[in-house]
């Protein structure tokens, strides 16, 4: 069963992976997507993409360093999400904004939670 998308779209402790840097980055992703929702401009969309891509790169680095077994599948999900976000243009449609929010919620709470205590 999917997890609900918070409204307003803000990070809370239910999203903690208990790696402070990654939690801070997740918080920043939520903030930039929230800002894109409220001020649907090319600059905010670009910032959301950059913050998300940088986080994915760092998270993947941690996975490689820890020899995390789910790395390849996890990286593929990141690549597919970034490709989808690259296809967005501002103003981003409500459907695409919801897609991004829902994807992040489901990804963190199902996929990212798998690496808790393993990195």
From Swiss-Prot:
Lineage: Eukaryota, Metazoa, Spiralia, Lophotrochozoa, Annelida
Family membership noted in the UniProt record: Belongs to the hemerythrin family.
PANTHER family, A to Z: BACTERIOHEMERYTHRIN
Keywords per UniProt: Iron, Metal-binding, Oxygen transport, Transport
Residue positions binding Fe cation 2: 59, 74, 78, 107, 112
Keyword Transport included in the entry's annotation: yes
Xref: PROSITE patterns: HEMERYTHRINS
Pfam families tied to this protein: Hemerythrin
InterPro entries assigned: Haemerythrin, Haemerythrin_Fe_BS, Hemerythrin, Hemerythrin-like, Hemerythrin-like_sf, Hemerythrin_metal-bd
Protein's UniProt name: Hemerythrin subunit B
GO molecular function, one term: iron ion binding
Classification via Gene3D superfamilies: Hemerythrin-like
Role description: Hemerythrin is a respiratory protein in blood cells of certain marine worms. The oxygen-binding site in each chain contains two iron atoms.
Binding-site residues, Fe cation 1: 26, 55, 59, 112
The keyword GTP-binding is annotated on this UniProt entry: no
